Regions:
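Enriched for short, Lys/Arg-rich terminal
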Residues: 2, 8-25, 29, 42, ...
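A short, surface-exposed loop/turn module that caps and links secondary-structure elements
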Residues: 32-59
Length: 84
């Protein structure tokens, strides 16, 4: 599966690399699991609704979420910080 970062997700990823290595490792685990099983697995995957219909989220921790969308063989990361 090809990994694509939206601009916001890339900025979030760079932020975590500079500020919290533990969260960076957690994001790596979530991405790896999502490429294998996009709609099940770790981080409590859940489909989003309303304006974000078609996107899914997984818990990075109690405060932050990884928001993503699967399109064919592409994994689009939309957000890696905050709670949508």
């Amino acid at each position: 599966m090809k990994l694509i970062f939206a601009e916001q997700a890339w900025e979030d990823y760079l932020h975590w690399q500079q500020t919290d290595k533990h969260i960076t490792r957690r994001i790596h685990e979530l991405i790896k699991d999502t490429t294998r099983n996009p709609f099940s697995g770790i981080g409590k995957p859940e489909p989003l609704r309303f304006a974000l219909a078609g996107f899914w989220s997984r818990r990075i921790n109690g405060e932050h979420r990884m928001v993503y969308k699967v399109e064919g063989n592409n994994l689009l990361l939309a957000q890696l910080r905050y709670h949508y």
